[in-house]
Amino acid sequence: SYPLIVKPTDSAGSKGVTRVDKEEDLKEALEYAFKHSIKGNIIVEEFIEKQGCSSDSDSFSVNGVLQFVSFSAQRFDENAAGTFVPAAYSWPSTMNMQQESELRSELQRLLTLLHMKTAVYNIETRVGVNGKTYIMEVSPRGGGNRLSEMVRYSTGVDMITAGVRAAVGDSVDGIEQKPYMGHWAEIILHSDKDGLFESLYISKSMRSYVIEEDLWVMKGDAVHFFEGANNAIGTLIMKFNSQEQLKEALEKQGEWLHISVD
């Protein structure tokens, strides 16, 4: 039954993903997914309406034991061409402790069944409007959009170093569950149209919350509308004093953040 979600199984950056609400739109969604699939493999799934924000963050297992799990609040730009391309993330998540605990237990069960050992994972989860928790996707690699870096900022847990050490056969240290040190957000800078990049404006009132500004384009560079993660032009890492402060800043981005494109 509809709605459905149609996506490639081997793409990245949320490219080729479409929500389908009626049968007459299915063919176009299938063609779009195939266009972005490397090997021509796609999947059609039930679309699960979410409660709060979905989560997309990184976690780490050591010798098959899930030593560290993180959950984020994944946010989207409803005005972007790619409505399923994450436009911002924040930590902690909008889930409650019971929901996160249930997901952690199920993730551990999954890794045990798959005989996983020592690895970093990009994990997408959500809570449905029915109150049930769902594991949407588990990839045995670090996520894009600097997620492991954001987790290092927000918790101090360094999965990047741990992943490299594991890859070369060295011992892995420092992977343990730690609390979040404040309220963190990552904004994926992007343009809402094709054109030439002109400037990035951040109001003075918000500058004190900016921990890192990473702009990947220069004035005059070509930029494209936000259809996939590959269309991002940079990131903004911010830290706030409260969840309310963070939420207000993300919801009112248009008032203090502007990307000029000619």
Report residues per predicted region:
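Active-site nucleotide/adenylate-binding loops and adjacent lid/helix of ATP-dependent enzymes
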Residues: 1-43, 63, 93-105, 109, ...
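Glycine-rich phosphate/pyrophosphate-binding beta-alpha loops
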Residues: 14, 139-155, 218-219
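Short, flexible turn/loop "capping" segments at secondary-structure junctions
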Residues: 8-10, 83-84, 226-231
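C-terminal catalytic subdomain
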Residues: 157-164
